[in-house]
Swiss-Prot record:
Keyword Iron (UniProt): yes
One MF term in the entry's GO annotations: iron ion binding
Gene Ontology CC terms: cytoplasm
Catalytic residues in the record: H286 (proton acceptor)
Residues bound to Fe cation: H329, E335, H365
Protein name from the UniProt record: Homogentisate 1,2-dioxygenase
Keyword list, A-Z: Dioxygenase, Iron, Metal-binding, Oxidoreductase, Phenylalanine catabolism, Tyrosine catabolism
E.C. number(s) listed in UniProt: 1.13.11.5
UniProt entry tagged with the keyword Iron: yes
InterPro entries reported in the protein's UniProt record: HgmA_C, HgmA_N, Homogentis_dOase, Homogentis_dOase_bac, RmlC-like_jellyroll, RmlC_Cupin_sf
Amino acid sequence: MSLQYQTGFGNACATEALPGALPAGRNSPQICPYGLYAEQLSGTAFTAPRAENRRSWLYRIRPGVQHLPFAPFAGAQRWLSDFGRQPVTPNQLRWSPLPMPDAPTDFIDGMHTWGGNGGPEEQSGVGIHLYAANRSMQGRFFYNADGEMLIVPQQGRLRLATELGLIDIEPYEIAVVPRGVRLRVELLDDVARGYMLENFGTAMRLPELGPIGSNCLANARDFQIPVAWYEDVEGDFELIAKFTGGFWRAPIAHSPLNVVAWHGTHAPYKYDLRNFNTVGSISYDHPDPSIFTVLTSPSDTPGTANMDFAIFPPRILAMENTFRPPWFHRNIASEFMGLIHGVYDAKAEGFAPGGASLHNCMSGHGPDADTFEKASHADTSQAHYIRDTMAFMFETRRVIRPTAQALASPQRQDDYYQCWQGLQKHFDPEQA
């Protein structure tokens, strides 16, 4: 089925699956249309500034409070929120893609935490995860009280059946599910693999554009929000909650995806990365990678993000007398990269779609030896067309602490450092 969407990042939306289900003129009437319950879902404090306030009013068949008590849940064993306090290696790290599971595995049980920082109780930091699944969630629903979830598919399409409507995403698209929104993740293909970032901090937003002006990068009009959809289903289900880093399970006798109408600003959304309006230099030098930012979560320090989500999409390089690939770099921020499709222009070999790399604070990184040699002798009088690629980066202000399971993973490339060992010494004090 072809899904319908509303458009516009951060818009105050209003949608109903049955005519007249949205109360007119008030949020909480004495009796709601169709015998529905009114429930507010708050994503920010009541007193948050209006421009940053996130809340939605839901009109649902049964209220969200109706379920049996929670008890600890034994699943999701590889989805972690405790990133430890042990010293972190400064070595550059890289991993090959996760293999697809052999046993039946859904989105929740197929999540593998690769690293993170901060935590849900601090309301700051991130969790970074890879997922690999081969079946839809069956008889279970999930919500994350710890943070919003940024889902980046690399292989296989997903349907996110949420309280506020349906979202379909495929590779090259992303979705963000706000804190607390209940959902069921369905596979639209036989298998699915990708990346997921948990943002424990301030909700993601579009970056400020500064001198770029009022257009470019990710344009607000291209973000899509679901329309109201509901299912009125009863049965023996389980509601799984992620709360303060732990997982909990509550029996529930009906589907919680029973919101017939809603209005507000706290809602899931999707975005097609192919719509990103890339900017760059048309004279010389490679600008800072902040020009590729899609979404950002601000911190309490102006100009310094809790986390940024940036992409490296197809683009045209026109800079003359310039080393065009991303330059060698040591950064106060920490960078986790993934590859959705193709080849990343700074790494000719070893970085495969579905793989990942981690370059932490002040750990050197940059193009491998082969890329450096080719770019150093390229004809920069001609434009270079980078096609058939899509890489991305999760950048955080804090050090990303890799988990023990990531460090011990058979997908870890222990020889990653070798890609720079072939860089030659070209220094000649007699020749400028």
